Amino acid sequence: MSFSRSEAAPAAPLPDLAATLAAPRDDAFQQLGAAFVTRLPAAPLPAPYVVGFSDDAARMLGLEPALRDAPGFAELFCGNPTRDWPQASLPYASVYSGHQFGVWAGQLGDGRALTIGELAHDGRRYELQLKGAGRTPYSRMGDGRAVLRSSIREFLCSEAMHHLGIPTTRALAVIGSDQPVVREEIETSAVVTRVAQSFVRFGHFEHFFANDRPEQLRALADHVIERFYPACRDADDPYLALLAEATRRTAELVAQWQAVGFCHGVMNTDNMSILGLTIDYGPFGFIDAFDAKHVCNHSDTQGRYAYRMQPRIAHWNCFCLAQALLPLIGLHRDAPSEDARAERAVEDAHAVLGRFPEQFGPALERAMRAKLGLALEREGDAALANQLLEIMDASHADFTLTFRHLARVSKHDARGDAPVRDLFIDRDAFDRWANLYRARLSEEARDDASRAAAMNRVNPKYVLRNHLAETAIRRAKEKDFSEVERLAAVLRRPFDEQLEHDAYAALPPDWASTLEVSCSS
């Protein structure tokens, strides 16, 4: 398989795209006003070059993949031309606040991200945002830059999560530069173009609530409802309905994270999408040797965002969103007094938040049932899945390979057990569980082959393990971007065998255990 690009690729209409982005802005979020955004050009990035590009994300935007080869592509998607755009067309950074590691952090905002415009395709509108585009009024002590290392990780994981079927922001491109930036060591700059229908976060609502700006809070909620939750308009209480939908999406999202062993790493409220998307890929990680207490973020010394904590933290974050929406809940109903409205709003919000476990639990159970190849629903299925996770935890069995190899287990006998059994230190514990599993499989009408095929459609063979990303990053630092492309291509087909790429599905090498990721990016 070749990952080189044809020199005969047709020229893409880059001037048309640049003109579209530079045209006077009509995207809805920036029209909310100066209380929400600050316009400014991107900081110049010297001698930019393309590190990675997603053909799939380009097609989603209605762009031709050949666009990446057009002269000026790297310049456009690091933001350099924005210095010449008219004031009405300038990119913008948005302001928000939030709780970080459970503590109110006050005003935050897009400290290094600029939204450069919207593109519409197939009835949807997408915002394009440049992460690493320079300082903004919300940069605090930061330099506004992103580094090559973290940009490649975000690019790869955004696309990997999409192809796993998990709601996520997307990534169109990574643009690099030799410009040095200081982190824990000297690194080089990069800009990742991320794409989403909206980058509105829980923290946007928290900001206007905390600053006692009810008009802006309502305008923001109305924008989100009108654009993304139109069904909420017809509810008895549109703002309560918004909270309910955002909470449901969040619960279902985290269930999907748990089902693939994904750890976000920094589940601050300013990193929570109002649309229920995975957003802000920083010190994330897919679990290798399973540990329910696994913490992927080296900076998270208290383990607040450990794998097992993610559902609880997501629920807590929804409480923060609910608090921010309280001034709006009940405004459409008659109430004898403001105190009565506020009291009823608290009751209604608590009722919505109380449904989170009822939404998360069944969503995770459905996912785990599918991962075990169980088409029928039985009362003991959740216990069977939990027992598997417990023995995986005790043996530190590889998360991804355990579920992938389970497809080889036969309902009739133990002859197919070896590949998954060998992942366990305590093989007697696995044998005991496997006997329970086989007994449960005997209740299913599907034969082994049909069940295995169904399991392989939900249990990925390939995930973005840290050592795979690290290998691509090390080569990219030497100006060899072929591994970024190769790895991205493999991750676009996570459920396929791709036998020529078996090495990407192997157990991590010993050196992978020394890798640490943190908030430094």
From Swiss-Prot:
Enzyme class: transferase
Positions that bind Mg(2+): 271, 280
EC number: 2.7.7.-, 2.7.7.108
List of catalytic residues: 270
A GO term for molecular function: magnesium ion binding
Cited InterPro entries: SelO (IPR003846)
The reaction(s) this protein catalyses: L-seryl-[protein] + ATP = 3-O-(5'-adenylyl)-L-seryl-[protein] + diphosphate; L-threonyl-[protein] + ATP = 3-O-(5'-adenylyl)-L-threonyl-[protein] + diphosphate; L-tyrosyl-[protein] + ATP = O-(5'-adenylyl)-L-tyrosyl-[protein] + diphosphate; L-histidyl-[protein] + UTP = N(tele)-(5'-uridylyl)-L-histidyl-[protein] + diphosphate
Disulfide bond residue pairs: none
Cofactor list: Mg(2+); Mn(2+)
Residues involved in ATP binding: 109, 111-112, 131, 143-144, 194, 201, 280
Keywords: ATP-binding, Magnesium, Manganese, Metal-binding, Nucleotide-binding, Nucleotidyltransferase, Transferase
Family membership noted in the UniProt record: Belongs to the SELO family.
NCBIfam families from the UniProt entry: PRK00029.1
Matches recorded under PANTHER family: PROTEIN ADENYLYLTRANSFERASE SELO, MITOCHONDRIAL
Function: Nucleotidyltransferase involved in the post-translational modification of proteins. It can catalyze the addition of adenosine monophosphate (AMP) or uridine monophosphate (UMP) to a protein, resulting in modifications known as AMPylation and UMPylation.
UniProt protein name: Protein nucleotidyltransferase YdiU
Gene that encodes the chain: ydiU
